[in-house]
Amino acid sequence: FRQEKEKTGGMSLPHRGSYKILSFTHYETVTSTQGVRQKLRMTVRVPADSSGQAMADPRKSVYSKGFPAMTFLHGAGTGYYTDFADVAEDLTSAGFVTATVDKPIWNTADFNRDYPASAKAYEQVLAYLASLSYVDQSRIGTYATSEGAWIEQIVERESKLVSFQILLSPMVYSPRQALGFFVTEDLSIIRANPGYASMVQRVLSFDSSIVHLPNIDFQFENNAKGQMYKIPTFVAYGSKDVMTAQVSGVSRIMELAHKNGNWNVTVRGYPIGNHVLRLGNEAMPDTLLADHYEDDVTNWAVGTSLGLKQTTSRIAGAQIYQSISIPDYVHGHKGRTILTLVVAGIMLLLLIAFTILCISSLIIKIGHLIQGRKEPVFGLTRRLRRVIMANSILSFFCLILFLAGIAQCIISIVNLIWGAAPEYSDLTYWSWPVSQIMAIMVIISMSSVFSGLIEIADRKTGQLMKRSPVNTVVADRKFGIVFFWVAAATMFFIMLFLALLGLFLY
């Protein structure tokens, strides 16, 4: 930043380590849209003098009107007042009053977060910072990561206190589009079968009103309620960030900022940094932030809070990269959602019924063995006995293999998100075609069984009309007949459920 004496009083700009740090705990009670209350813990850090025992006097620094302030907005999942400690200490040591708070979650989970109330909660934190006598109300900023960037859009629109913002790996597009992008891209990175990516698109086409996921189509962009990205903005991405659409995200931020008359947008890319700019696997303790990031973000915050003119390039650092486009074509389909849920519900009920019948047959068989009786349990005809058993086992293995492939994809993606190196598992690729082959074998086999049953039934009808003795078509025991039709129906609905997920389309 250019040194401007009229704004700095001829004093040198503070940097990381210019001040020692004092901290204290504060509590704020926030309320959700449903009226649920949560007591947030907050760590407030303030610049201290050289002794480290008393707060520094802003009048003796470039911050003659009061220290600038910063609060932090959490990303997805849970968050605590102990988070962001390293960045908060960096900023405080450069003269900022910082507040790190518990994430406002109330009684919600990731899929039903109360975004409007979360924004109000963070606004309440901003108001608290503004109420401090040693804080300059015109120099308060926000630091948002990942999901927090969605909430920051609401905060920026509704709060008059925010004068600049730092967005770390920001989510820009709607949750449906963001999920579609990062899951599809990550499946490609872990070399999963492309069929799983096509399945993701079908799952994300579920109607949110039916599955009670209102946030998936939450419209964070709402110019009718106020402009967005109208304040100085610092955007940072890591080259190993596998969750955000970096090129599309930056383009959208620039588009909205320029539309609202803001040309003060700085973009930085950092090599090796993951989704939250940590180095390595963030699941491990004490992972560091990307090289130079802490200096860059601190220097930018100091210069911007003082209103200085930036002399470095607006866009710099590692090249930002994006392998696929944003899936803006994905939207909710009510009919498909209802059909899939109905089929899934019936399939689960049939699986439970089939399991009960299998357990019952085992108990009956054990009873026969104890009593020395050799009579059959099901009484199925010889033709059906082997086929129904083989197809039942094949159907269950097909479903289990399919679900195992999905589970392995999820595990690999989670590790990738945390910053670990990609894990290539053969299961994520061959489970898809093998499931297809097994499913087709079941369909062909059962088709031959039912065609044979139709022939037999037709022949038996003729025998009945001639009043000739009639042999059993399916089984000579009611338990066997029930078992056959429940097993057949279970296999049918398993295949139908897999078909609705797109198993036979790719």
Describe each PLM feature range:
Residues 294-334:
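Juxtamembrane amphipathic/hinge helix adjacent to a transmembrane helix
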Residues 2-311:
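Soluble extramembrane regions of membrane proteins in the secretory/endomembrane system
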Residues 321-506:
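Extended non-globular C-terminal regions
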